[in-house]
Design a protein with these regions (language model features):
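Acidic/aromatic/glycine-rich contiguous surface patches that form carbohydrate-binding/processing clefts
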Residues: 244
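Extended intrinsically disordered or low-complexity regions, especially N/C-terminal cytosolic tails and loops
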Residues: 1-236, 248-342
């Protein structure tokens, strides 16, 4: 049983010096204690069954990366789920190489997600301004958004507050300050470069349908409703890439829509739901098929294949099938460029 109990007051009155107002009585899981680098290495060797061939190298890596990011982030791949120890033969170097592989994956995906982000920024600013004009008061006007439903109203109010923050006071962006100072106005095409992918995606989702349709027509075989779902997922993955979180096993609570590529790749289904390519890393690979032009997409897939092949050729601590399973990739994922989008 866990109970909150107030400490006894000293006879002289007042609260106990240096004590919390309440303490926990009963059986609890104690917070993990601090370990120095040598203790961390000993724990990995003796308690976690991890081979460490070069302790000096291991210590240097832990200084650069941190125990939590490296071991906490990548332990599940090579651990026995029953014993909570690493599988026999797993080395510290195996964990480090997996960490570096994921880092390279983040860099690759982020580079192409930024291309999508820039395209959405360009198109949203173009079609919004085409309809409403270049004065900043237009994108600060709630009537220029789809102001139906309480949720939309709250989201629009929050978005406009963000936009106002850029144009009503000095910012760190010289081009915004220059436009405001010289012209007394910051057109949307100037502002969008400072906005995050999340900001511009939210703006797209809150725009009237006619503007959404015009934007979506720049992407083959994707309608405005599908675009909303795709952008929601891509924003989440972009943030994972940008913030250095573990990417290759990441799953979102949101999903991209069922697209023709799912069917053409004959992705397995559980009931009516596709097993892969909905909220995992492969969902991004599929979404990029529709959101990038053909040249960029071919370059992306070429780089992705090379990165995966290099890792698998160099390391046998995880099989190709295991890696694909963790990433949400079907075995025939390499065929994705053979199929038309529709």
């Amino acid at each position: 049983m866990i109970a909150l109990q107030k400490p006894v007051r000293p006879a002289t009155g007042g609260e106990p010096a240096g004590a919390p107002l309440f303490y926990i009585r009963g059986m609890v899981h104690m917070q993990k204690i601090f370990l120095n680098y040598d203790q961390q290495i000993e724990k990995l060797k003796n308690e976690k069954n991890l081979l460490i061939n070069n302790e000096a190298y291991a210590k240097e890596i832990l200084k650069q990366t941190s125990y939590y990011s490296l071991i906490g982030g990548y332990k599940d791949i090579s651990k026995n789920p029953t014993t909570k120890k690493y599988k026999d033969g797993t080395s510290f170097e195996d964990i480090v190489e997996l960490y570096y592989f994921d880092e390279l994956l983040r860099q690759l995906f982020l580079r192409y997600l930024i291309k999508v982000e820039n395209g959405i920024k360009s198109q949203v600013s173009y079609y919004f301004t085409e309809k409403n004009g270049e004065n900043q008061k237009e994108y600060l006007d709630t009537s220029n958004y789809n102001y139906s439903g309480k949720k939309n109203q709250r989201d629009i109010d929050r978005l406009i507050k963000i936009l106002e923050g850029y144009v009503t006071k000095p910012t760190d962006y010289h081009y915004i300050n220059h436009s405001q100072k010289k012209y007394g106005n910051v057109p949307l095409w100037v502002l969008t470069n400072a906005l995050t992918f999340g900001n511009i995606s939210k703006m797209y989702m809150l725009l009237p349908q006619d503007i959404q349709i015009k934007v979506s027509r720049n992407y083959q075989c994707v309608n405005e409703k599908q675009m909303v779902s795709i952008l929601t997922v891509l924003v989440k993955f972009r943030n994972v890439c940008a913030h250095g979180e573990r990417l290759f096993t990441y799953r979102t609570a949101d999903s991209i829509p069922d697209l023709p590529i799912h069917r053409k790749l004959k992705i397995a289904q559980k009931g009516s739901q596709y097993v892969n390519g909905k909220n995992d890393l492969f969902s991004v690979v599929i979404a990029l098929r529709y959101m990038l032009n053909d040249q960029w997409y071919r370059e992306f897939i070429k780089e992705l294949k090379a990165l995966i092949d290099k890792y698998l050729k160099k390391h046998d601590s995880i099989s190709e099938q295991e890696l694909y399973e963790k990433m949400g990739f079907p075995e025939n994922w390499r065929k994705i460029t053979r199929y038309r989008k529709q």
